[in-house]
């Protein structure tokens, strides 16, 4: 058996199949571009799915690859097992060879056996195989061509040895190759009662696609039989390096050593080191492929993996952010095979560090809540509502809580957690419901030809009319409705661009268009009629050209902004949404932190530089594949027709877009950013104005500056210096006022000492401190605690319509009286609630008329509480 590094195995596999006339195909992205049903690329065949289905052709019929895969979230989820078993990973590499109607079973079996026994020299006696129980072809090839004894060819009748792409479509039997680790490890061969043991490990699966399953379950032979194989790189590396666990191979040894270093871990066998070492691989590659941490979809899976790693690092003893420091170690191990890691190192590290720091703020508090709850828990199941509270309040994914439970030999109530989640989702859906849209109620089978790219006015014929949700033949004076034309210059709302407005002129009337939307293949012109308009009328449709020009400026500026963000912030930036109006543009994009003022200034400068370059815009219709080959940016997850419209701005920007644009970039005039904000986890929003609107905005800001200068008696050049000086003076005066209030409160407090009473051997002071600022209450309580030495204090004050309450307990008495309980007793009587530490707690209320009664009730409450 030949000892090889992981990198050597990967290369030798690809070289071997290249020598067998296979095209070496690079790993595709972890984000499947051709399968919306998959969260992540989880097998080598995913990038070839359309080839297998006959929907795509390639210039080769044989291929080989080493495919990056992630299994975490969705149907294929290994997350909870990672670190606790020898072979579960969130990220792994799948070595594979594929035949698209070329060779079939005989050569697939021959190639696999040749690679294992001749190339990497595995002992033949250590190998055995499984076949589907009635696959006589495979049996004969293994027996006659390879020479395997019949007792090492195991027939399996279950679905484990029959693969299918779905309920219908391509399918076929499998043949799996197993390696025997030896009698010293417990376990039996596949198909035996002991098959779940670790002695016999599957290393390679050969799938023979030979049938097409019909809706009725019958299976017809495929016209072109194909082969799909997959071998886990980490598994074969463990065998060739003479170790039993994947975590002992060269690649993981380096990552585990780095993880131990950054977490100060002492025990190199700690399972948490495995978790951290595994998770840095999936997290780094996901970020490299454009996934950002968020609260939904792929981004949430990434967030869960990061948070699980951070929790395990915390468990190992890590102080502060540590996870991002492992990126360098990962690049050292895998950067040669995947140079994109090194290229994006800075971005990957930054995303991980920010996410870790944000979670670190709640991790300690959440763990404390969990520990406290577990100490009071009866039984070995963590309630679903607690799991939900940790998720909702502290950002603990349920699988992180399950991880903690597993370490305590406990489980979580998944059903209860899902019920809580269902309630939350229902509430969110109800909150998000708005009035029904016209278009939700209407259907049209008409087709409108769009003429608006080249003209602002066009003759047309009315082909359909709606009044409300009813199809009618006529709209009469003052009536609102929808008019559908056979041709129109009006752009229908889509791709983030608002619909056009304008007029549709007809003999005997005029239809004022207030919006244009799509209704299937028809364009729906919404508006109100003066006079009349009806079916088959000949009309002239004219858009509001001035408004359209403003929209065009904003749409083209959006394209320039998008490219600028990618150049300045990083290629991880992707469009998450946009709104192109006449008044302004709004652009939502993926980014992991707020854009700084300096970055915004640079973004604005670059966009305006590109505008001044005055590049000509060109549009072209082309095949979607040709557009992507030219580098046209497409929105991920969007469905495009086979033919798409490509908008190019000089040599700066190229995007798929159906919207309207200026003829040259210089037509935009000026671009000015109005605001930048966060709208969701990992999503930022920039709003901006262009052209005359930008000039008006700058003029307005200049006027505001002049107004401020006039107020502070300065000119515009020195206004900042003058305002800064005034703020400094204001802070000094506020500090002096606070000091005076503290002195007044202390003096008032001293006079309260005469009100101290002793109940059950404990001093108690209750007072309504009229006229005292609520901000001064805490200082007053501290001062009183020092003066009385040992005791309990309850103070209240009413101002306007509010009540402020505070309770203080000296440290020696917190075992008998809790400040939080006392302040909440009072707060419940004045329409409020509060909280704090055992020795100091505050509350507010909205019923000042009940303050006296609340304070009067303290004596009885305290007497009962302190009885021995």
Swiss-Prot record:
Q: What's an example GO cellular component term for this entry?
A: cytosol
Ranges where the record places region Disordered: 828-847
Its catalytic activity? tRNA(Ala) + L-alanine + ATP = L-alanyl-tRNA(Ala) + AMP + diphosphate
GO MF term list: alanine-tRNA ligase activity; aminoacyl-tRNA deacylase activity; ATP binding; tRNA binding; zinc ion binding
Report the cofactors. Zn(2+)
Give the InterPro entries listed for this entry.
aa-tRNA-synth_II/BPL/LPL (IPR045864), Ala-tRNA-lgiase_IIc (IPR002318), Ala-tRNA-ligase_IIc_anticod-bd (IPR018162), Ala-tRNA-synth_IIc_core (IPR018165), Ala-tRNA-synth_IIc_N (IPR018164), Ala-tRNA_ligase (IPR050058), Ala_tRNA_ligase_euk/bac (IPR023033), DHHA1_dom (IPR003156)
Q: Which SMART domains match?
A: tRNA_SAD (SM00863)
- Positions binding Zn(2+) in this chain are 555, 559, 657, 661
Copy out the cofactor comment.
Binds 1 zinc ion per subunit.
The record's annotation in CDD domains points to:
AlaRS_core
Enzyme class label: ligase
Enzyme Commission number(s) from the entry: 6.1.1.7
An example of a Gene Ontology BP annotation on this entry? negative regulation of DNA-templated transcription
UniProtKB keywords: Aminoacyl-tRNA synthetase, ATP-binding, Cytoplasm, Ligase, Metal-binding, Nucleotide-binding, Protein biosynthesis, RNA-binding, tRNA-binding, Zinc
Compartments annotated for it: namely:
Cytoplasm
* Main function: Catalyzes the attachment of alanine to tRNA(Ala) in a two-step reaction: alanine is first activated by ATP to form Ala-AMP and then transferred to the acceptor end of tRNA(Ala). Also edits incorrectly charged Ser-tRNA(Ala) and Gly-tRNA(Ala) via its editing domain.
Task: Name the family.
Answer: Belongs to the class-II aminoacyl-tRNA synthetase family.
Domain topic, free-text comment = Consists of three domains; the N-terminal catalytic domain, the editing domain and the C-terminal C-Ala domain. The editing domain removes incorrectly charged amino acids, while the C-Ala domain, along with tRNA(Ala), serves as a bridge to cooperatively bring together the editing and aminoacylation centers thus stimulating deacylation of misacylated tRNAs.
Its protein name is Alanine--tRNA ligase
Please name the source species.
Pseudoalteromonas translucida (strain TAC 125)
The beginning of the lineage is: Bacteria, Pseudomonadati, Pseudomonadota, Gammaproteobacteria, Alteromonadales
Recorded name of the encoding gene: alaS
């Amino acid at each position: 058996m030949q000892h090889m590094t992981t990198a050597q195995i990967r290369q030798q596999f690809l070289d071997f199949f290249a020598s067998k006339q296979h095209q070496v195909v690079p790993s595709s992205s972890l984000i499947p571009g051709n399968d919306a049903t998959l969260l992540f690329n989880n097998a080598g065949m995913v990038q070839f799915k359309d080839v297998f289905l006959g929907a795509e052709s390639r210039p080769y019929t044989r291929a080989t690859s080493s495919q990056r895969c992630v299994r975490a979230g969705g149907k294929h989820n290994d997350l909870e097992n990672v670190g606790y078993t020898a072979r579960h990973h969130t990220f792994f590499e799948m070595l594979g060879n594929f035949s698209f109607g070329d060779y079939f079973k005989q050569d697939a079996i021959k190639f696999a056996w040749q690679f294992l026994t001749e190339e990497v020299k595995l002992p033949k006696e250590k190998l055995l195989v499984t076949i589907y129980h009635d696959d006589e072809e495979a049996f004969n090839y293994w027996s006659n061509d390879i020479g395997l004894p019949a007792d090492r060819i195991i027939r399996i009748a279950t679905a484990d040895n029959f693969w299918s792409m779905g309920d219908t479509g391509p399918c076929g039997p499998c043949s799996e190759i197993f390696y025997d680790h030896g009698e010293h490890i417990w376990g039996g061969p596949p198909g035996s009662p002991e098959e779940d043991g670790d002695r016999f490990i599957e290393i390679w699966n050969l799938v023979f696609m030979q049938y097409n399953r019909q809706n009725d379950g019958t299976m017809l032979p495929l016209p072109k039989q194909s082969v799909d194989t997959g071998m886990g790189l980490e598994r074969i590396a463990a065998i060739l390096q003479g170790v039993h666990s994947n975590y002992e191979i060269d690649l993981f040894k380096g990552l585990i050593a780095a993880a131990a270093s950054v977490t100060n871990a002492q025990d190199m066998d700690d399972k948490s080191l495995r978790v951290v070492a595994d998770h840095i691989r999936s997290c780094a590659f996901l970020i490299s492929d454009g996934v950002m941490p968020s609260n939904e979809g792929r981004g949430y899976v990434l967030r869960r993996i990061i948070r699980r790693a951070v929790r395990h690092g915390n468990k190992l003893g890590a102080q502060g952010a540590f996870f991002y420091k492992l990126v360098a170690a990962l690049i050292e191990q895998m950067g040669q095979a995947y140079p994109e890691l090194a290229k994006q190192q800075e971005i990957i590290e930054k995303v991980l560090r920010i996410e870790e720091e944000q979670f670190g703020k709640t991790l300690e508090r959440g763990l404390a809540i969990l520990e406290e709850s577990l100490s009071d828990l009866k039984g070995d199941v963590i309630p679903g509502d607690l799991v939900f509270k940790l998720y909702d309040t502290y950002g603990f994914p349920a699988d992180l809580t399950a991880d903690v439970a597993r370490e305590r030999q406990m489980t979580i109530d998944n059903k209860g957690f899902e019920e809580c989640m269902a309630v939350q989702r229902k509430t969110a859906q109800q909150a998000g419901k708005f009035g029904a849209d016209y278009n939700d109620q209407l259907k049209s089978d008409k087709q409108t030809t769009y003429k608006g790219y080249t003209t602002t006015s066009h003759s047309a014929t009315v082909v359909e009319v709606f009044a409300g949700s009813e199809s009618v033949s006529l709209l009469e004076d003052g009536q609102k409705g929808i008019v559908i034309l056979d041709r129109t210059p009006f752009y229908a709302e889509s791709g983030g661009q608002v619909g056009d407005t304008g007029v549709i002129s007809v003999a005997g009337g005029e239809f004022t268009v207030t919006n244009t939307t799509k209704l299937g293949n028809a364009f729906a012109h919404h508006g109100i009629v003066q006079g009349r308009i009806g079916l088959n009328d000949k009309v002239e449709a004219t858009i509001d050209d001035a408004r359209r020009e403003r929209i065009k400026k904003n749409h083209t500026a959006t394209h320039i902004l998008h490219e600028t963000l990618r150049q300045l912030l990083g290629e991880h930036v992707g469009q998450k949404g946009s709104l192109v109006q006449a008044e302004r543009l709004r652009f939502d994009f993926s980014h992991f932190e707020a854009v700084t003022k300096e970055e915004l200034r640079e973004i604005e400068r670059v966009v305006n530089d590109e505008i001044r370059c005055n590049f000509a815009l060109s549009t072209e219709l082309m095949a979607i594949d040709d557009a992507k080959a030219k580098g046209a940016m497409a929105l991920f997850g969007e469905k495009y027709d086979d033919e798409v419209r490509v908008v190019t701005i000089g040599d700066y920007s190229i995007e798929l877009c159906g919207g309207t644009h200026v003829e040259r970039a210089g037509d935009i005039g000026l671009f000015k950013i109005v605001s930048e904000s966060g709208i969701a986890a990992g999503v930022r929003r920039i709003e901006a104005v262009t052209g005359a609107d930008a000039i008006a905005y700058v003029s307005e800001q200049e006027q505001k500056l002049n107004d401020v200068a006039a107020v502070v008696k300065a000119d515009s050049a020195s206004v900042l210096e003058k305002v800064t000086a005034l703020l400094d003076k204001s802070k000094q005066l506020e500090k002096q006022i606070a000091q005076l209030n503290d002195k007044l409160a202390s003096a008032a407090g001293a006079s309260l000492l005469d009100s101290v009473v002793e109940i059950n051997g404990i001093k108690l002071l209750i007072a309504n401190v009229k006229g005292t600022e609520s901000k001064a209450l805490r200082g007053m309580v501290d001062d009183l605690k020092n003066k009385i030495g040992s005791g309990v204090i309850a103070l209240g004050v009413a101002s306007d319509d509010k009540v402020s309450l505070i309770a203080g307990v000296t440290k020696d008495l917190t075992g008998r009286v809790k400040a939080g309980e006392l302040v909440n007793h009072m707060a419940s009587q004045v329409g409020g609630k509060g909280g704090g530490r055992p020795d100091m707690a505050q509350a507010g209320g909205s019923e000042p008329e009940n303050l006296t009664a609340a304070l009067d009730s303290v004596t009885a409450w305290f007497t009962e509480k302190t009885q021995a």
